[in-house]
Amino acid sequence: MSDSPVIALAKDLMSRNSVTPEDAGCQDVMIARLEKLDFVIETMVFDDTTNLWARRGTQAPLFVFAGHTDVVPAGSLEQWHTPPFEPTIIDGYLHGRGAADMKGSLACMIVSIERFLAEHPDHTGSIALLITSDEEGPFINGTTRVIDTLEARNEKIDMCIVGEPSSTHAVGDVVKNGRRGSITGDLTVKGIQGHVAYPHLADNPVHKALPALAELAATTWDNGNTYFPATSFQIANLASGTGASNVIPGEFDVQFNFRFSTELTDGEIKRRVHSILDAHGLNYDLKWTLSGHPFLTDEGTLVEAVVAAVEDVNHTKPALLTTGGTSDGRFIARTGAQVVELGPVNATIHKVNECVKAADLEKLTDMYQKVLEKSLV
């Protein structure tokens, strides 16, 4: 039996070894389909990253599908049941790297647009796709650079679906209508190196830092709100010493991360952390890396359309959550656009034997098409 249009396209994309930041021709496959639909194609290459901005129409509102063609490395090939870049259906599941994250979603986007335009060629507004090959990597030259380009020419996105695998047990059971912010601190506490037998001649930075770290870990940063859990502080890495048991270290390196809600700003986090470190009298350097601000789309046309579309297909309402890591939605949300994430089940993402139910991709295609209908008809 031949594959359905969405499965055939998903397999075509998945067969391409597009480990970040490689695109491996995936965007060319999408472009060939979009050109037949009269999309204006714009390829934006920034350093090692290939980005696609494809738009049909010039009127508002502008509805955008956003996603990425890059995937994480396959890892040990011996642990895969099937070759990771030879997509195969086994017992109703489509296996291969990118099945869930997120080439399956890309196929659903394209096919849903094709079907929507066949039925509604004179729809209101415009449709676009924003696709990058730099989501799984450092995310420097991908979506954020495309957004900078669009903003510079006053091209405004009104609504955006990001095809990240948002679902937990069944496709569409969870819709992400926001994400927590993420900020990382790289802390170096300075002391004086010495012999462990002569502690009075040294200054142990580990001993001095531990009470401060304990206070940071015990602090209630906020209580969250209706949409976000309380802000989380986690120590990720610790490093100190020479490896010898008789040397007091001269420095202590600590890396920690905050996943923060809309109750806090990155500025407030920095101020409170510095206040605690200073109160403990530490001599330190602290470098901050902000990965993204929290964002929330709590009401409006898009959330209503997505919830209704999922309910039409699944006959149950999805949960609206903000859990999980960061996504490229944060770069789009900063423009004021309504942003929602809707995609496949995420149980196997970034794992060996990544897979997704083939039937789920058919459902997701239907959901995307219904969102378009509810937003642009």
Swiss-Prot record:
Keywords: Amino-acid biosynthesis, Cobalt, Diaminopimelate biosynthesis, Hydrolase, Lysine biosynthesis, Metal-binding, Zinc
Zinc in keyword set: yes
Catalytic activity, as annotated: N-succinyl-(2S,6S)-2,6-diaminopimelate + H2O = (2S,6S)-2,6-diaminopimelate + succinate
Molecular function, one GO term: cobalt ion binding
GO annotation terms (biological process): diaminopimelate biosynthetic process; L-arginine biosynthetic process; lysine biosynthetic process via diaminopimelate
Free-text function comment from the UniProt entry: Catalyzes the hydrolysis of N-succinyl-L,L-diaminopimelic acid (SDAP), forming succinate and LL-2,6-diaminopimelate (DAP), an intermediate involved in the bacterial biosynthesis of lysine and meso-diaminopimelic acid, an essential component of bacterial cell walls.
Keyword Zinc annotated: yes
Taxonomic lineage of the native organism: Bacteria, Pseudomonadati, Pseudomonadota, Gammaproteobacteria, Vibrionales
UniProt source species: Photobacterium profundum (strain SS9)
The protein's annotated pathway: Amino-acid biosynthesis; L-lysine biosynthesis via DAP pathway; LL-2,6-diaminopimelate from (S)-tetrahydrodipicolinate (succinylase route): step 3/3
Entry annotation: catalytic residues: 70, 135
SUPFAM superfamilies (UniProt xref): Bacterial exopeptidase dimerisation domain (SSF55031), Zn-dependent exopeptidases (SSF53187)
Superkingdom of this protein's organism: Bacteria
Entry's EC annotation: 3.5.1.18
Binding note for cofactor: Binds 2 Zn(2+) or Co(2+) ions per subunit.
UniProt binding sites for Zn(2+) 1: 68, 101, 164
Top enzyme category: hydrolase
Subunit description: Homodimer.
InterPro entries, per database record: ArgE/DapE_CS (IPR001261), Bact_exopeptidase_dim_dom (IPR036264), DapE_proteobac (IPR005941), Peptidase_M20 (IPR002933), Peptidase_M20_dimer (IPR011650), Peptidase_M20A (IPR050072)
Cofactor requirement: Zn(2+); Co(2+)
Family from the record: Belongs to the peptidase M20A family. DapE subfamily.
Binding site for Zn(2+) 2: 101, 136, 350
CDD domains (alphabetical): M20_DapE_proteobac
Protein name as it appears in the record: Succinyl-diaminopimelate desuccinylase
